[in-house]
């Protein structure tokens, strides 16, 4: 009689590989229920669980203690919280120790969950997580099969318009979108500014598609000599806060961009197809002097699929883009180089990679 843990032999690149059938089944089941993890994490964020643990003496609390701090009226709250937190421990989002004769579980933060606690600037990835889990985004997945079979953009098929049109007409979704970008930019830029020194000799910097201006505000704060222009659609910049040294300018990057000796684009090119990217980059080329440069911050997808954490993150983002943008996608180093050359730039320098954002300099 066969074992419940039956194994079979596979070959990978000519080498025998033993794969445990139980492990394969478990992984398939986990994929079938994968939505549970982000939803449980978001629930913990909404309840403020990570902040509560972060503020606790010793940095550890039981589910009962968390429920008390939350002033939960539901008598089953401690049990419900404990079940959610146990799941997060199994994915290393939290860690756990057992205390006392009753074996009470005490939960603490890990290096992952610290990103769901607002930092000194109030930024956390919890606000970023709210975007892909927003009802508007979630509904877009219902349009993927039809888009594959018949064409079109999943988001457009479901909502009847492009995501940026939708955001301009739906203030709630627009707030969620820009809050996500604000928080991601705040967290990423702090670390980028520690490693990337390419702004030191810039005198006039234009952030194309800069949203509410948080990216430029952080750069201008570190480099106050820079004349900073935050450039985005008029309805976007009209809601932007005032920052020292930052001027907000409304316009359309497909028509023209303000002049500067350096132009910055963070998470912009991956929103558009190659033809649209070339239009944007050619406008940037025209707006920079002979010794100018365009600084692109974007994920870079490996030439062949990988299983590293960064490659998984990039692939997740790439497929997310597929649901909302017609030609938007993550690109390889080779594809970015081809875009740079195609727009007239002489070359590209891959300066560094921080927070899975590759900082690329396109030189004239």
UniProtKB/Swiss-Prot annotation:
<dbReference type="GO" id="GO:0046983">
    <property type="term" value="F:protein dimerization activity"/>
</dbReference>
<comment type="subunit">
    <text>Homodimer.</text>
</comment>
<keyword id="KW-0808">Transferase</keyword>
<dbReference type="GO" id="GO:0032259">
    <property type="term" value="P:methylation"/>
</dbReference>
<protein>
    <recommendedName>
        <fullName>Anthranilate N-methyltransferase</fullName>
        <ecNumber>2.1.1.111</ecNumber>
    </recommendedName>
</protein>
<dbReference type="InterPro" id="IPR012967">
    <property type="entry name" value="Plant_O-MeTrfase_dimerisation"/>
</dbReference>
<dbReference type="InterPro" id="IPR029063">
    <property type="entry name" value="SAM-dependent_MTases_sf"/>
</dbReference>
<feature type="binding site">
    <location>
        <position position="253"/>
    </location>
    <ligand>
        <name>S-adenosyl-L-methionine</name>
    </ligand>
</feature>
<comment type="similarity">
    <text>Belongs to the class I-like SAM-binding methyltransferase superfamily. Cation-independent O-methyltransferase family. COMT subfamily.</text>
</comment>
<feature type="binding site">
    <location>
        <position position="232"/>
    </location>
    <ligand>
        <name>S-adenosyl-L-methionine</name>
    </ligand>
</feature>
<comment type="function">
    <text>Involved in the biosynthesis of acridine alkaloids. N-methyltransferase with a strict substrate specificity for anthranilate. No activity with anthranilic acid methyl ester, anthraniloyl CoA, 3- or 4-amino-benzoic acid, salicylic acid, catechol, eugenol, caffeic acid, quercetin, theobromin, theophyllin, putrescine and nicotinic acid among others.</text>
</comment>
<dbReference type="InterPro" id="IPR036388">
    <property type="entry name" value="WH-like_DNA-bd_sf"/>
</dbReference>
<dbReference type="GO" id="GO:0030774">
    <property type="term" value="F:anthranilate N-methyltransferase activity"/>
</dbReference>
<dbReference type="Pfam" id="PF00891">
    <property type="entry name" value="Methyltransf_2"/>
</dbReference>
<feature type="binding site">
    <location>
        <position position="209"/>
    </location>
    <ligand>
        <name>S-adenosyl-L-methionine</name>
    </ligand>
</feature>
<dbReference type="InterPro" id="IPR036390">
    <property type="entry name" value="WH_DNA-bd_sf"/>
</dbReference>
<keyword id="KW-0949">S-adenosyl-L-methionine</keyword>
<keyword id="KW-0489">Methyltransferase</keyword>
<dbReference type="GO" id="GO:0008171">
    <property type="term" value="F:O-methyltransferase activity"/>
</dbReference>
<feature type="region of interest" description="Disordered">
    <location>
        <begin position="1"/>
        <end position="20"/>
    </location>
</feature>
<dbReference type="InterPro" id="IPR001077">
    <property type="entry name" value="O_MeTrfase_dom"/>
</dbReference>
<feature type="binding site">
    <location>
        <position position="266"/>
    </location>
    <ligand>
        <name>S-adenosyl-L-methionine</name>
    </ligand>
</feature>
<dbReference type="InterPro" id="IPR016461">
    <property type="entry name" value="COMT-like"/>
</dbReference>
<dbReference type="Pfam" id="PF08100">
    <property type="entry name" value="Dimerisation"/>
</dbReference>
<feature type="active site" description="Proton acceptor">
    <location>
        <position position="270"/>
    </location>
</feature>
């Amino acid at each position: 009689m066969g074992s419940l843990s039956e194994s079979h032999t596979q070959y990978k690149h000519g080498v025998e590989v033993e794969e445990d059938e139980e492990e394969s089944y478990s992984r398939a089941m986990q994929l079938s229920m994968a939505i549970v993890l982000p939803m449980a994490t978001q629930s913990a964020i909404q309840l403020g669980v990570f902040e509560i643990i972060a503020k606790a003496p010793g940095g550890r609390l039981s589910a009962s203690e968390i429920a008390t701090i939350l002033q939960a009226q539901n008598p089953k709250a401690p049990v419900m919280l404990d079940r959610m937190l146990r799941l997060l421990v199994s994915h290393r989002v939290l860690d756990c120790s057992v205390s006392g004769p009753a074996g009470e579980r005490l939960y603490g933060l890990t290096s992952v969950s610290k990103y769901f606690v607002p930092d000194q600037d109030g930024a956390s990835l919890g606000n970023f997580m709210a975007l892909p889990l927003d009802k508007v985004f979630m509904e877009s997945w219902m349009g993927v099969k039809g888009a594959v079979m018949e064409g079109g953009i999943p988001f457009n098929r479901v909502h009847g318009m492009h995501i940026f049109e939708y955001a301009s007409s739906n203030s709630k979704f627009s707030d969620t979108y820009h809050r996500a970008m604000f928080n991601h930019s705040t967290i990423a830029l702090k670390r980028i500014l520690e490693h990337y020194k390419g702004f030191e000799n810039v005198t006039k910097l234009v952030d194309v598609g800069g949203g509410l201006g948080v990216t430029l505000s952080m750069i201008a704060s570190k480099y106050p000599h820079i004349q900073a222009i935050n450039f985005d659609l008029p309805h976007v910049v009209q809601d932007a806060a005032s920052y020292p040294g930052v001027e907000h300018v409304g316009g359309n990057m497909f028509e023209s961009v303000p002049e500067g000796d350096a132009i910055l684009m963070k998470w912009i090119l991956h929103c558009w197809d190659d033809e649209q990217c070339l239009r944007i980059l050619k406008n940037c080329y025209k707006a920079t002097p002979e010794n100018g440069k365009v600084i692109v911050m974007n994920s870079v997808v490996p030439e062949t699929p990988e299983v590293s954490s960064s490659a998984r993150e990039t692939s997740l983002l790439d497929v997310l883009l597929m649901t909302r943008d017609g030609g938007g996608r993550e690109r390889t180093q080779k594809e970015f180089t081809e875009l740079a050359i195609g727009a007239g730039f002489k070359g590209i320098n891959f300066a560094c990679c921080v927070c899975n954002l590759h900082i690329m300099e396109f030189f004239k």
